[in-house]
């Protein structure tokens, strides 16, 4: 997989932080299987309880903290840096389907080696769009959520990260700290853009694009 390939190249201390997960599927699962330690954070208490049970059953001796909390601009840096026993976060994953752009903008990423974040594929490849910051935002699969790949790439470029991979499924993008960028091909967000839209019916896609066009929740950044 992409993560495994990246960490064959990027040095690491086997430490991760992942924000936003499903108990049955998340980006750090294979890292945990390999003995990595870290934090898993999600706002959904049911997901947190289910994941704790799964991890305790299958991986009894792991050093993974599962935290139930809402991610906000005012608490993100404290959550990420608190009690971390290493100077670096080797793998940081963000997928909250809402204020992702604003969380990344606020977060100190200087000690992150590799970053993965979900982008809103419905927003296309050419516009720098994100939803306005809204602590009460609730995700709906209507196209109105998160940020475009171009917006995230430009934001992270200003934080010394480069785009090096995009999942073929059109879900996640991977960025590397510029300390390691010479080891990879740096990608263009417009040329590497992928979309999940092919899995939706024509009527559903038409509805989603209409929602996006009419929404007052997006802003250009």
Task: List the predicted regions and their residue ranges.
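Active-site glycine- and acidic-residue-rich loops that bind
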Residues: 93-103
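Rossmann-like AdoMet/SAM-dependent catalytic core
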Residues: 1-12, 17, 27, 34, ...
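Structured loop/turn residues at beta-strand edges in well-structured enzyme cores
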Residues: 11, 87, 110
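A short alpha/beta connector and helix-capping loop motif
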Residues: 66, 102-138
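SAM cofactor-binding core of SAM-dependent methyltransferases
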Residues: 1-82, 91-94, 121-124
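Short SAM/SAH-binding signature in class I
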Residues: 87-93, 114
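Short amphipathic alpha-helix with an adjacent loop that forms part of the alpha/beta core around
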Residues: 76-86, 105-108
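A short helix->loop->beta-strand "cap" motif at the edges of active sites that frequently abuts
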Residues: 36, 111-113, 161
């Amino acid at each position: 997989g992409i993560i495994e390939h990246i960490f064959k190249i990027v040095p690491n201390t086997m430490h991760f932080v992942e924000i936003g997960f499903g108990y049955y599927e998340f980006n750090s699962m294979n890292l945990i299987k390999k003995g990595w330690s870290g934090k898993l954070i999600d706002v959904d208490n049911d997901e947190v309880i289910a994941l704790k049970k799964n991890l305790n059953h299958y991986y009894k001796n792991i050093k993974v903290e599962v935290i139930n909390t809402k991610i906000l601009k005012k608490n993100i840096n404290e959550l990420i840096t608190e009690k971390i026993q290493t100077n670096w976060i080797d793998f940081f994953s963000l997928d909250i389907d809402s204020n992702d752009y604003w969380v990344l903008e606020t977060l100190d990423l200087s000690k992150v080696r590799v970053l993965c974040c979900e982008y809103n594929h419905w927003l296309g490849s050419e516009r720098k769009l994100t939803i306005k910051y809204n602590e009460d935002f609730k995700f709906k699969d209507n196209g109105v959520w998160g940020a475009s790949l171009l917006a995230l790439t430009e934001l992270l470029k200003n934080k010394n990260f480069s785009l090096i991979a995009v999942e073929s499924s059109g879900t996640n993008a991977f960025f590397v700290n510029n300390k390691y960028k010479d080891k990879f091909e740096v990608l263009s967000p417009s040329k590497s853009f992928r979309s999940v839209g092919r899995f939706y019916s024509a009527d559903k896609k038409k509805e989603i694009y209409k929602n996006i066009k009419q929404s007052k929740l997006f802003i250009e950044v």
